[in-house]
């Protein structure tokens, strides 16, 4: 008796992390993709890669794996943490407010206080573990909560 597909279990996180999008290279025979250490790509290539910070074959593979794990339509990875901070914060507009945990990476604090403040985006830092902060949090009415 064959399995008719009604009892097939959906792959879990571990399986998806290892095997999602698994292919092998006809050219080299490698099963796992190599790490691409180049920073620039030939203009007009099939994949539209131009500079590694904006994407490369490894980014694309990671995005596909994460998208599969999260069962989502889209995923974006970044070349650095501060580029992720900038991308997320750039979705805000003047008058928006960011509520932040007080124990935050220093460069993120500087980005919020020195760069985005110029664009009318306010950041409030508070201890999320302190019950006394609840009123402050409610009164602030943040657009974005940064954990």
Segments and roles (model prediction):
Residues 2-35:
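Short conserved active-site loop signatures built around small residues
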Residues 35, 40-86, 90-91, 107-116:
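Conserved N-terminal alpha-helix of the aminotransferase class I/II PLP-enzyme fold
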Residues 69-72, 93-98, 117, 140-145:
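Short, surface-exposed connector motifs at secondary-structure boundaries
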Residues 71-72, 83, 97, 131-135:
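Well-ordered alpha/beta subsegment
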Residues 91-108, 126-127:
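Conserved PLP-anchoring active-site segment centered on the Schiff-base-forming lysine
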Residues 115, 119-130:
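A glycine-rich helix N-cap at a beta->alpha junction
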Residues 128-147:
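Active-site phosphate-binding strand-loop segment of PLP-dependent enzymes
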């Amino acid at each position: 008796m064959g399995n008719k597909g009604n009892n097939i279990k959906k792959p879990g996180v571990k399986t998806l992390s290892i095997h999602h999008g698994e292919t092998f290279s006809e050219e080299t025979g490698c099963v796992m993709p190599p790490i691409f250490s180049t920073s620039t790509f030939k203009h007009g290539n099939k994949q539209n890669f131009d500079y590694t910070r904006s994407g490369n074959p490894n980014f694309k593979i990671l995005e596909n794996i994460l998208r599969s794990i999260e069962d989502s339509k889209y995923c974006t990875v970044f070349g650095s943490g501060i580029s992720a901070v900038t991308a997320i914060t750039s979705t805000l507009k003047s008058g928006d407010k960011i509520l932040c945990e007080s124990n935050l990476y220093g460069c993120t604090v500087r980005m919020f206080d020195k760069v985005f403040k110029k664009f009318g985006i306010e950041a409030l830092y508070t201890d999320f573990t302190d019950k006394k902060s609840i009123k402050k949090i409610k009164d602030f009415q943040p657009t974005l909560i940064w954990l």
